[in-house]
């Protein structure tokens, strides 16, 4: 993302919602950005909470110290596979032992510096590794990990075939997905999307170069999605009809209260 665009977006968010929780990643590896530490520092200067998710392939000692010293609040390590064979078949050109050591080193530094960074290890539950997960979790015994999360395979709104990899779940949720009530996604080039699952940009709602967060948050396009989800009409939204990542209502990440006209109430 262009630096000036980043500054505009952050200033816009901090003005509209000073309690926002910023997830500084979207369909890419955030540590590849040359100014990632500057981004975190600027967000913290604006008193915003910052979460970063990384695959840790390039997380060296210098970057580990940098993330901690920049004031990062939350970090999630995405690890695809519990053993060398599975991991390296998915994360091409990455080395299982090296990436694990990157994570272990970060955790050791976190402990040494007594850093208050909420730390999550995230594993996708796949049929091939389901029985190996307990042994993998034991690798983190004694290290300052706050949570080890086993995630359902995400089909990215129907764009990825999960049939050969995922542990199957069945049924239709009896609650509306909460994402359009608690978040917006912004692409590297400034496009507003209703949620982070829209990697294919199926439902562009505006452009951060010209539109404000407040206008998009209360705009007609996101209102339409909220109303459809609130009545269970997932099939009427192209983005949502094949999504397997529907979430129950949560207050973990919130925007300011939406007034009744914008809430999609029935």
Positions of PLM-derived features:
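Short, small/polar residue-rich loop motifs at catalytic or cofactor-binding pockets
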Residues: 178-180
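C-terminal accessory region of radical SAM enzymes
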Residues: 108-118, 138-175, 191-192, 197-250
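Short, acidic, Ser/Thr-enriched surface-loop or helix-capping motifs
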Residues: 186-187
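Short secondary-structure boundary micro-motifs
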Residues: 6-8, 72, 167-170, 190
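Short catalytic/ligand-binding loop motif for oxyanion handling, primarily in non-cytosolic enzymes
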Residues: 32-33, 60, 83-86, 128-133, ...
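Short hydrophobic/aromatic beta-strand element in the GNAT-like acyltransferase core
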Residues: 183
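Short cysteine/histidine-rich metal-coordination sites, predominantly Zn2+-binding motifs
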Residues: 1-5, 255-265
